[in-house]
Amino acid sequence: MNKLFRPLIQVAQKVWFRQRRKGLRRRIQQQYGNSPDADIREVVAFLNRHAELELPMGMIPPCDWTRDYAPERISVERDAGNGLLYVKVKEHQVFFPRRFSPAEVQRAVSIGQMEQDERSPHCYVGNGFNVDEGDVAVFIGASDGLFCLSLVERLAKAHLFEPNSDWHEPLHATFAPWGNRVEVVPLAVDSQDAEGRVKLDTFFKERPQPNYIQVDVDGGERDVLAGAHGILQDAGKLRLSICTYHQRLDFPKFEGLLGGLGYRIHHSPGFFLIGVRMPYLRRGILYASRGTPQSPAWTWRANE
C-alpha cells in the first residue's frame, strides 16, 4: 500500500467505525429482541439494564458477573531465585515476562481467570467437554500458560506453542515441576512450514497424535486448521476448542469444516459483543469432538 494513502485509509476507517457505532444498541435490540435463544435474550436484557455502557464492548462479556474479577484482588510476588514476578494459582507459581509490572500481571491474571469462568463465552472447557486422563494436549497461543496449568495434572504430554519470545522464560519456569511432560515450542502454528512457523501435521508426523487441541491465535485460527488437515481427518479421538470471535464469520465456517469431517459441534456459553457489523453477537469458543462420549448436558450441533 502506498505510504501516502495509508493515513487517509486509517482516518476513513475510524470515521466509518464511529458512524457504525451510532444506533448500535437500537439495531441490536431490533435484531435480537424477539430471539428464542436464551443466551441472546440474556445479552439483550443486560443491555437494557445498562444503558450507560458504550458499545461495542470488545473482550468484556456482556454479563454482570464480570465485576467479580477485579485486578486488585490478585496478589503478585517476585521470585528470589529467577527474579520474575509470579502469582500463586492452586499452589503453583505462574511466572510473567520481565517487562511486566505488578499491575500488568494483576490485569493479565484477572482477565485469564474471567475468561475461564464456566459462564464465560471464552471458556475453553466445561459442562461435560474436557480432556481425559492421559491425553496428549496442544495449546496454540499458550501465552501465560494459565489454561494449560488447569489441566496439566491429567495430561500425559502438553505441547505449548508460543512464538512470542517474551513468554519463553516464564513458561519454562512455570512448568519446570512437570519436566519433559510439558514442552514449550517457540514456533507459530500455520498453514505452511517456514522459518519460525510449522504445520501441526508436520510437527506431529513422528510424535504421538494429540487428543485435545486449543487454538487462540488472534484471527489466525483458519491457518492453524489448514495446517492440521491430516490430523483432523484421521483422528480417532480428538477434541478441539477454537476461538471464533476474532473473525466475525469463523463460527459457521469452522462448524461446516469440522462438521463435514464427522465432528460433533457445540459452543461456549453466551456471546461477545465485539464489532459494528452483522452478526453483532459472536460465539467465543467452538467445541468440536470426535470419537468421544457425547455429553448428556448438551444438544450437539451434529453432522452425524
Describe the residue ranges of each PLM region.
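Phosphate/nucleotide-binding beta-alpha loop and adjacent structural elements of enzyme active sites
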Residues: 1-304
